[in-house]
Amino acid sequence: MLCRCVLASLFTRTERIYLSMYIFFMSLGCDKNLVDSEEMLGALVSRGFEVTDDESQAEVIVVNTCCFIHDAKEESIQAILDMANYKTEGNLKALIVTGCLAQRYKEEITKEIPEVDAVLGTNSQAALLDAVDEALKGKVSHVFTPLEGIPQVPGKRMITTGGFYEYLKIAEGCDNHCTYCIIPKIRGNYRSVPMETLIEQAKQLAEQGVKELILVAQETTIYGTDLYGKKSLHLLLKELCKIPGIVWIRVLYCYPEEIYPELIETIRDEKKICHYLDLPIQHASDRILKRMGRRTSKQQLVDIVSTLRKEIPDIVLRTTLITGFPGETQEDHEELMEFVDQMEFDRLGVFTYSPEEDTPAATMEDQIPEEVKQDRQAELMELQQEISLERGEKCVGKDYLVMIEGKVADENAYVGRTYADAPGIDGYMFINTGELLMSGDFVKAHVTGSLEYDLIGEIADEYTE
């Protein structure tokens, strides 16, 4: 203890080192939030904090919150309340709340949960260390940096995904202002991260053993328009492909209307880029798309999907839909069902509409009963289940490169992913083998069977990058 105090006294307030002080970090919400969490964790670890997975042991707890939909908001509030209990039941000295819920409800959090020592906005992660300093001195702080300017990317991140895939957040904020979405108000306008910053961060991740980069943002397709005056995602991708050690590069959150020829060509021609795109289309009824504030028509969506499949025949397309949006009639729902049946997306998720305060959609007339929303969601997912099963059956007999993620307990089998599957949201391939494999290995696997969303296979031959 004496050594710890003496060493800490050698540093100024903004450089204080916390030797052997435990921190528990809870990251809620999307993969973009996870990137923020890993950046904050990296800063804390560099200052001497030791990360623990036992919240009762922690002297500092940080909750990075989400409030995108009602359920996420409730989860975040409950998480803060649960962590606040450790002020009396554990070792907790400082409780820090950050993220989207903190940005949106800073006054309410401070008033209703007095155990919270600091509230940081979505653009204030750089202030975390100072906030911890103040909290450990018994001082309450609130930091809300304006939602503008080039996103600041701090030093080395702490990888929490297992070490072999990582998300690379290429932009912050959003300019779309869809009528159901609060993100522009809590994340600000669209701001690209400079290309050289992203390349340096990607190199650091590769040096730490990362083999798959997954590019994320509220919208990836317009990357660079604010910095370079033109869409530059294809240029960023080409630079990332040059990094040694990276085997796969995957792109999520591509708004369909912003996909452009150079991007398609780059995805098609660069060997490291997975032939996989995530296209959040939300609906197919022109009337509902207009009410949502989307910028595409159903025919444009059909044309975009057709172009992608023509130019990249083995491309895997994922999309997300919202059902039960205000004013959605049974005819609108049936039109969406027909569209899904026609398009046969490889991967598809469906959310029921969640009214968010301070959004235009929340005050629209003709709100849909929750039971109807859930029924429509179930119908869409039942249809997609049939499509997925048929597509899986077509994979039987083919060989795929697979990244191993782990071993099935008590069985001679491993779990992995093909290029067609993004982590956490898509399916897996279960590989039966007596060979010893490690997480992060790449193997060539032969598909012997299929399930509704997953594949079954065996080793064809090992692949080493």
Describe the predicted segments one by one.
Residues C3-C5:
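Cysteine-centered motifs
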Residues C67-F68, R187-G188, L227-K230, K290-T296, ...:
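Short glycine-enriched, charge-decorated loop/helix-capping segments at active-site entrances
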